[in-house]
Amino acid sequence: MNKEEVLIITFKSIQDVLELESITKNGRMIPVPSCVKAGCGMCFMSKDLNIEKWRVFLEENNISYEDIVRVDF
């Protein structure tokens, strides 16, 4: 099975994941993969691998997050 690198954004609360999903179409909410630790059990996955761009976007939109990591998925 071919894996591809994706960006995973983790959150402490599901409300933050839902808020991000409601304002961008550049990814989707998924259960947290076993290789990643997260507080709420759900995360946001995107094929856009630009971590700094995501950090700025999250901060500009006042969305709290735990971590942003790249994983093979």
Show the residue positions of the predicted features:
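Positively charged, small/polar-rich N-terminal and surface patches that mediate targeting and assembly
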Residues: M1-F73
